[in-house]
């Protein structure tokens, strides 16, 4: 059955996301943490603006996750506390909601969850059908694809050129972008292969299992009722390989995917095995606290929480044939760095 159509991001207010940390700040220290709300601004632009306003070095302004431009977003940024007086409380399109000092600088990936409030418009499907799909999604989760934001506008082409050279970029940011893009692309291809084979929820010995809400994982030795119950409850999910240096044997499903991959993908994986550290990512994820209501027959409002690194657009794409209204008005100079939610 075709997916129902829906329009996303008709305005920035239709897509709201807020980072959530799960640890207290010390209230003192050399670093100023700011919880900032911004509209129609991406993270890279705001960091450059703060550097301009304060004369702080750009490298000393830190973020946890990179957030999309076409949204209203709340996120944490930090900078040395000595620049606090030079940093205004607001600017064009942004406002600091909270300031706290902390002993440590903000690190990438410090937040644990993202809370979303999303409005979809122009829906052309029966309400009961969509509500049944939402119930199933809450129970079974959705395919945990890296979203298009991860790849920017030209990152795949740039990464492929470095693979063809067999070299790494010298600049740290560009190097991280190349490896991130290639790993995400390979992971998405594995996930698509398991979807096509209908094995996303069918574990086999040798598969890697991920503990929900963490990066901890283990190798499945045997498939029994206890393991299947943990999968069904969402306590664990099957894991997909983020290619890189890997000491343990790869699961049979990953080996089969790699053997069937085209030459370009195989060369990219060998490149990653030389230059990147291996990792694992859950193939499915269940949203927390999912709620919805219908303002009218063709408009759906969704609210839910996802772990850091999972994409709301992937959740939505599992349910709808999406038309992203913001893409029609995207200028070509939007930074193309990968977006880590």
Language model: regions and residue ranges:
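Non-catalytic, substrate/partner-engaging modules appended to enzymatic cores
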Residues: 1-341
